[in-house]
UniProtKB/Swiss-Prot annotation:
GO cellular component entries: cytoplasm; nucleus
GO MF annotations, alphabetized: mRNA binding
Subcellular location: Nucleus
Organism encoding this protein: Encephalitozoon cuniculi (strain GB-M1)
Protein name, per record: Probable splicing factor ECU05_1440
Keyword vocabulary terms for this entry: mRNA processing, mRNA splicing, Nucleus, Repeat, RNA-binding
PANTHER family: RNA RECOGNITION MOTIF RRM DOMAIN CONTAINING PROTEIN, SERINE_ARGININE (SR)-TYPE SHUTTLING MRNA BINDING PROTEIN NPL3
Lineage: Eukaryota, Fungi, Fungi incertae sedis, Microsporidia, Unikaryonidae
Pfam families: RRM_1 (PF00076)
Length: 301
């Protein structure tokens, strides 16, 4: 059970690091690699307590902490990178092959060109064939070359034929989580708040969330409830409540498309404000129509 620590200042010693992280649990091993290093804990709970705290600083210097991914290079990776490199397209005139003098055998130069878009033997990525293969000329509205081919839309007298450059085909609604309408965002929470402490606070008020996590900026949390009634009651009861000396604010979770739509509307309203003479005057500042809406940029599942 290992975590990664980065941005370690030069004046911070190994003893200081072990003493600081010892408050979260027993540190079994410390391995420093200069400005970064790795810590081993005796239990998974210790790592969870470290990661729940949003900020860490040692001797006044902030450091970054995250879970170690644990990936390792294969033993034969160095050989392939230095000598063969066959997995990256074979021979290239732009690659330096002077290191091959120590290899068992030099690389073989060969042509590895992939089939082109109009190669008559292969179909393109959208299911069509090359013009030479089909025997017709290339057209932007060719149904076989359309990204979202539809028998109805290509024959519809109202819609007509849509080619691959049609904006209605290139832009789709974002796929958000189906339970976003059951989520509540609690803003203005105290820094370094553990998610378990805040979850216990919500449960003490009679609500049982099905999902909870801290926001990426560290000053808000996202809770998901089982139904709309619990969500509405939690927003009404906990809005203005005090937690660790901070007054909480609640709002509904904004999906990506809803956030973009409200931000666009807010920007248009702030840019064109009518003056006394009836003319539109650009404003220097932009005010969001929803307080705390900037935090929704990072709140996407």
């Amino acid at each position: 059970m290992q975590i990664f620590i980065g941005k370690i200042p030069n004046h911070v010693s190994e003893e200081q690091i072990k003493e600081y992280f010892g408050q979260f649990g027993e540190v079994t091993d410390v391995s420093l690699k200069g400005t970064y290093g790795f810590l081993n804990f005796d239990s998974e709970g210790s790592i969870t307590r470290v990661l729940n705290q949003r900020t860490h600083s040692i001797d006044g210097a902030p450091i970054s902490v995250e879970r170690a991914n644990g990936r390792k290079r294969p033993l034969d990776g160095e050989y392939h990178d230095r000598y063969m490199d066959m997995g990256r397209g074979g021979y290239s005139p732009h690659r330096d092959y002077r290191g091959f003098r120590n290899a068992p055998y030099p690389p073989m130069r060969y042509e590895s060109r992939s089939p082109g878009r109009y190669d008559p033997r292969f179909s393109d990525r959208y299911g069509g064939r090359s013009p030479e293969y089909r025997g017709d000329s290339f057209r932007m509205g060719d149904p076989q070359r359309s990204r979202d081919f539809c028998e109805y839309c290509n024959a519809c007298p109202i819609h007509g034929m849509r080619d691959m450059m049609d904006s209605r085909k290139r832009h789709h609604m974002s796929r958000d989580h189906p339970n976003n309408h059951l989520k509540v965002v609690f803003e203005n929470i105290a820094p370094n708040t553990a998610i378990e402490d805040f979850k216990n606070f919500v449960q003490d008020h009679g609500f049982e969330p099905s999902y909870a996590r801290l926001g990426y900026s560290g000053n808000h949390a996202v809770f998901e409830f089982k139904n709309i009634e619990d969500k509405d009651n939690a927003m009404k009861k906990l809005d203005g409540a005090e937690f660790n000396g901070h007054i909480l604010k609640t709002r509904s979770y904004l999906s990506k498309d809803e956030y973009k739509s409200r931000e666009r509307e807010s920007h248009m309203r702030s840019e064109l404000q009518p003056t006394d003479n009836g003319e539109a005057e650009p404003q220097g500042t932009t005010t969001d129509i929803y307080e705390g809406i900037e935090d929704a940029k990072a709140e996407n599942d």
